[in-house]
Amino acid sequence: TTCCPSIVARSNFNVCRLPGTPEALCATYTGCIIIPGATCPGDYAN
């Protein structure tokens, strides 16, 4: 599960992923995090 701190970060993450960029790279670039579970922490609710 990818969790982002804002809607803007989520949008940027989604655009980053469009050409097939690895999830981990896009998460680092946008400030999002990748977690093993299904529930994002409160400060990464997007």
From Swiss-Prot:
Belongs to the plant thionin (TC 1.C.44) family. Disulfide bonds join 3-40, 4-32, 16-26. Two isoforms exists, a major form PL (shown here) and a minor form SI. Transmembrane segments: none annotated. GO terms for cellular component: extracellular region. The function of this hydrophobic plant seed protein is not known. Its main location: secreted. It comes from the Eukaryota. This is Crambin. InterPro entries: Thionin, Thionin-like_sf. The keyword Disulfide bond applies. PROSITE patterns: THIONIN. Pfam families: Thionin. Changing residue 25 to I: In isoform SI. It is found in: Secreted. Keywords: Disulfide bond, Plant defense, Secreted. The keyword Chaperone does not apply. GO terms for biological process: defense response.
